[in-house]
Amino acid sequence: ITARLTKGLEAAIPDLEQRVDHILTKQVFGIGITDLTAKLARRSLYCSKWANGPHSIAKSFETEAGNVWFERTEHIWVGGTERVLTADADGHQIKKFTNGKCLYCGAGQKALDRGDALESHAYAFIHTDDITALIADLFGEDMQFDVIIGNPPYQLSDGGGSGTSASPIYQKFVEQAKKLEPRLLTM
């Protein structure tokens, strides 16, 4: 996409550096599904882990993230059946239900409710009731996407045991992307 935009905007923005900066700051946006995928996308797009770094080919960004967003998202657990007593961060005893499923993706709580040290695999793109509002919140304005390209995961473990049980989630990414009404959607 960026190569086609670079060639297509040559007459409108003759200076290559200005054209690339315009494309990367105004026309290309991304949402990482994990911290690692966001960093990989930034390296691919900006030639730098940081969009505003000295090696970035985009020179107008003020933030390290640029237009590739990632923020840890948590699952919303529902339907837990077992209650355990545990403590919160301040040491106060609390009751916690286990063996639930995520409201948005169906992932098993037993497999993925494992604290802040490990990846949650709760993807913001599908963990929302209003994807349009989320996109506006992330990128600061109402956005209209002509093209959406994605490579979402196909499934998540649902805690069913020994890797043979999984919740399909690919279709949830497709459904959310369709709500953004792009002219072209490819996953």
Residue ranges of predicted features:
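SAM-dependent methyltransferase catalytic region
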Residues: 1-187
